[in-house]
């Protein structure tokens, strides 16, 4: 047991991360000294090996096949009637399950139609599930665990005619998504320094979103992985080549609809100049 091991260990000092260690385990330590600081493991894990990156590339192809099959099926199915937020979630999971090395979904799917799309972390239940109609927007945030990688993708899909307001909001989100994906930046920059790239076109119109623009993605591990993030709040973790990240700006109009566009991306070397090493972003999705 962990507790017994900590009580019995006394030869060297022990490093404990106060953000991740329970008070119960902390009090069980009987070593000479507790060094309280962030664990070095997440930062090392965040930079993916060549084998892990190759796994992402393979898994993204398979996940893309499932998504394309789903998108081909979706519109005719909605037009035929009978589909709901829950039923289309089950269909997408079934298509992913046909792919090699599929093990499970990587998180509970967010399938929000019309006003439900404006709820950032909406999850359909039997009580909230609504039928889909051949009109308006469906926000679909989903992912899978394959044995060689973890995926995370969001698409906002027009199920039929949409309003001019929907088109405008979608365009702003797409602009922000592209702006971040095209970024070139110094090695070691923080995600906070990049965050405004995805928001600037929205800020011009007095619009904003209140979630992070991007998070790390594990390799057949947690779909949300740190320590690096792209968000407005200061995040000191440096961005390095080999890190995976999401690019997912959005806009949400309460009671009306929401738009989010998300790819999983890879940070890569760009060039080295007299001013240092620079990085760029490649979409893996």
Provide a role label for each language-model segment.
Residues 1-285:
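Active-site neighborhoods and metal-handling regions in enzymes and metal-associated proteins
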């Amino acid at each position: 047991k962990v507790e017994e091991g900590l009580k019995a260990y006394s030869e060297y000092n022990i490093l404990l991360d106060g953000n991740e260690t329970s008070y119960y385990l902390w009090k069980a330590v009987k070593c000479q000294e507790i060094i309280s600081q962030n664990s070095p493991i997440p930062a090392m894990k965040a930079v993916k090996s060549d084998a892990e990156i190759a796994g992402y590339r393979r898994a993204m192809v398979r996940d893309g096949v499932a998504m394309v099959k789903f998108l081909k099926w979706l519109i005719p199915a909605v037009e035929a009637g009978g589909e709901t937020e829950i039923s289309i979630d089950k269909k997408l999971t079934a298509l992913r399950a046909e792919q090699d090395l599929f093990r499970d979904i990587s998180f509970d799917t967010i399938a929000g139609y019309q006003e439900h799309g404006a709820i950032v972390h909406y999850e359909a239940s039997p009580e909230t599930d609504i039928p889909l109609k051949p009109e308006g927007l469906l926000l679909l945030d989903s992912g899978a665990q394959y044995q060689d990688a973890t995926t995370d993708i969001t698409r906002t899909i027009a199920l039929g005619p949409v309003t001019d307001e929907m088109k405008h909001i979608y365009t702003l989100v797409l602009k922000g998504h592209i702006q971040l994906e095209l970024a070139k930046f110094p090695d070691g920059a923080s995600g906070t320094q990049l965050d405004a790239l995805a928001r600037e076109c929205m800020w011009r119109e007095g619009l904003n979103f209140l979630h992070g623009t991007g998070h790390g993605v594990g390799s057949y591990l947690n779909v949300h992985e740190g320590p690096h993030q792209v968000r407005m709040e200061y995040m000191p973790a440096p961005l390095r080549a080999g890190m995976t990240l999401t690019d997912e700006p959005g806009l949400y109009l309460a009671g009306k609809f929401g738009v989010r566009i998300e790819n999983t991306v890879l940070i890569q070397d760009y060039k080295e100049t007299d001013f240092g090493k620079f990085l760029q972003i490649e979409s893996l999705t």
